[in-house]
């Protein structure tokens, strides 16, 4: 389960009246806290919880490290990403992070999915590596 990113760090929040961004940051944080508490209270196991806020903050701070060229201008301009295809996108927007004021682009979704995949697969890689390391240490 992926929680909300910091909505206060979106182009929508940047274009909103003064004071809106901190409020949106607080609201997205409160939602994520309630989501986590609800998940814990449900007693359900086997559900991985991912908080994308640190990832989004890092992408916004260091976009080029992720292949992102722009984190402030939506690929669809002022339009909603709903119904905004390649023909409606602004030129050069394939490396933008936001499709519209709040929604991520295809590139952003790929970055997020890579992050989730690496988080889920890392424990198995460590498990595979540990016996190999023990074996190599034994024979050397």
Report the location of each language-model feature.
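Aromatic-lined glycan-binding groove of carbohydrate-active enzymes
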Residues: 35, 55, 105
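Mobile, glycine-rich extracellular loop/lid and propeptide segments
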Residues: 1-4
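Stable alpha-helical elements in mature extracytoplasmic
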Residues: 27, 31-35, 49, 108-112, ...
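Sec-exported extracytoplasmic/periplasmic mature domains
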Residues: 36-44, 61-64, 114-122
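Extended non-globular C-terminal regions
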Residues: 138-139
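Mobile gating loops/cap/lid regions near enzyme active sites that modulate substrate access
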Residues: 6, 11-25, 41, 45-102
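Histidine-centered active-site loop/cap adjacent to the catalytic His
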Residues: 79-132
């Amino acid at each position: 389960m992926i929680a909300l990113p910091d909505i206060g760090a979106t182009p929508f929040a940047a274009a909103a009246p003064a004071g809106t961004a901190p409020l949106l940051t607080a609201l997205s944080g409160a939602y994520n806290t309630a989501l986590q508490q609800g998940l814990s209270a449900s007693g359900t196991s086997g559900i991985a919880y991912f908080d994308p806020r640190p990832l989004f903050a890092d992408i916004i701070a260091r976009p080029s490290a992720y292949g992102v060229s722009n984190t402030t201008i939506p690929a669809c301009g002022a339009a909603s990403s709903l119904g905004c295809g390649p023909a409606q996108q602004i030129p050069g927007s394939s490396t933008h992070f936001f499709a519209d004021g709040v929604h991520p682009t295809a590139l952003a979704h790929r970055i997020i999915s890579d992050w989730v995949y690496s988080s889920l697969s890392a424990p198995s890689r460590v498990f595979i590596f540990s016996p190999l390391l023990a074996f190599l240490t034994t024979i050397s």
